[in-house]
Amino acid sequence: MVVKQEFTFLSGDGKTDVHAARWLPDNGDYRAVFQISHGMIEFIERYELFAAFLADKGYMVVGHDHLGHGKTAKTPEDWGYFADGESPEILIGDMNKLRTLSQEPDKPYFMLGHSMGSYLLRRYLSVYGGGLSGAVIMGTGANPDAVAKLGMAVCKAIAAFKGWKYRSPFMEKLFFSGDFQKFDMDGTHPENSWLTKDTEIVRFYYSEPRCTFKFTLKAYYDFLKTVYYVNRKENVEKIPKDLPILIAPRSEER
């Protein structure tokens, strides 16, 4: 049996209660902690089956809904907007706050980041990587600096006319162009989805409002700023050299 507990903590933005959850064996005894950082336009409870699987194997699993996602966003209008100011620093600060609440001196501590969460984890490791037992970077990428800088410039240009909370169809199309085009991107052909080969999960994803909202310009800008940061050599070198890291690519990546 697995026990699930939900709780909140105050975000680094100073005003938002972050929704979080932990899964652990029903006897309360666990051998290590596994923290998950979810991806773009989803929420931590999408990982519930995976978390329950690990808890059944003797791990405590923790994770939270990033700002602008899931139950951390108080209304649908809040979805897709992280925060004013330096959002990437706030986001990784929230990840560290959850770690501080969950880590014990005698238990190994691992972190996993998927998709957008993988970029956040890479940034996190360059700042807070000390003391971890290992990290899993899943579904990440290596983008040229020029691409991220161009994307940020486009966001700024549109925001000058529309504001940072504008949900831009152009940025969405730009973000999900290229290799994404050969996959189903709206759930009409779940057997060819970019998400997973499990068609039941694909159908759930596209029926769930917490997975189908649009990012704001500010969120795209903050994400691209993080992409730019993590691909800089000087920031990669800030990650502890002795930290074991597993890089788990998508099935068609090389």
Language-model features, listed with the residues they occupy:
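Short beta-strand/loop motif that positions the catalytic acidic residue
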Residues: 247-249
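Alpha/beta-hydrolase-fold enzymes
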Residues: 121-210
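Alpha/beta-hydrolase fold nucleophile elbow
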Residues: 104-115
